[in-house]
Curated annotation (Swiss-Prot):
Probable rhomboid-type serine protease that catalyzes intramembrane proteolysis. It is a multi-pass membrane protein. Belongs to the peptidase S54 family. One of its GO terms (molecular function) is serine-type endopeptidase activity. It catalyses: Cleaves type-1 transmembrane domains using a catalytic dyad composed of serine and histidine that are contributed by different transmembrane domains. It comes from Candida albicans (strain SC5314 / ATCC MYA-2876). This is Rhomboid-type serine protease 2. It is found in: Golgi apparatus membrane; Golgi apparatus, cis-Golgi network membrane. PANTHER family: RHOMBOID PROTEIN 2 (PTHR43066:SF1), RHOMBOID-RELATED PROTEIN (PTHR43066). SUPFAM superfamilies: Rhomboid-like. The chain crosses the membrane at residues 17-37, 66-86, 98-118, 124-141, 160-180, 182-202. Keywords: Golgi apparatus, Hydrolase, Membrane, Protease, Serine protease, Transmembrane, Transmembrane helix. GO terms for biological process: proteolysis. The active site is at residues 128, 187.
Amino acid sequence: MINFDEFPPKYDPSLRPPALTTGLIVFTFMLCVIKSVTSYTFESLILYPRAPLDLNLNSISLYSLFHVNFFHWICNIFTLATPLAVFETRNGTIHTGVTLNLLTVIAALQYCIVGLIFYPNTGVIGLSGIAFSLMSYMAYHESKFRPIMHTFHLSNSLEIKLYTLYVPFVVAIVFMILFPSSSLPGHLFGITTGYLLSYGYIDKLYPPSKVITTIENKLSSLINFLELIVTFYKEEESLVTRGSVGYKPLFNQDIEHGAANAASHGSSAFVGETRVLGTRESTV
């Protein structure tokens, strides 16, 4: 399978894929198949700005699981799979599941609040918002080790620096150009939600680790069965990675060199990720 402890990820036949990442891919694919072969459109689960006022809590928490078509699903999975797998291997399977729920709901509330004024009839679905959130989360942490992603030398006296912290915004603009029907607001709120995660502003919304450990103990038989085909990253093991070890940079680079760069280039900014917006039904 893929070794997500390295970047770019490398194929390792001895590894099984992360449980949550694999399950999300399979589950959303099945939903896409159901939508394609039946007349059910999941209309009630499209996120519209009025969802909080209408108390449509299902759309606020589940809109990201559904897609317009297979192409939309493939694009989102291609964007999300690697960062989600990296996050899961470092933070634990259940912790990652809680994170996805928090990112989904927080981004949805931002989208709805602003949308009531600027795009009241525009709905969104899809996983790209979460993808942009994880992108911004990683961009924030990567910026501590590699503040500048790339420097473009336009002439002897002119150069443009692409700061790692701003990469998600660049990606969002590129998506807007390549896919005009995509939701720029959705992507931007995915990015801001990723920053909230990065700066620790939503940490208090997580359940205590003891609760997660208790759940894992009660589901131990099911977890042992799943580990025949996937890797389940348990809370006790992941606490070490999240706590004492800290963030491990994706790109191979000397940490002291990265720290020196960070000091010389000043403070960091924001990063993030999301997806599609349209007239009546957009893709996030």
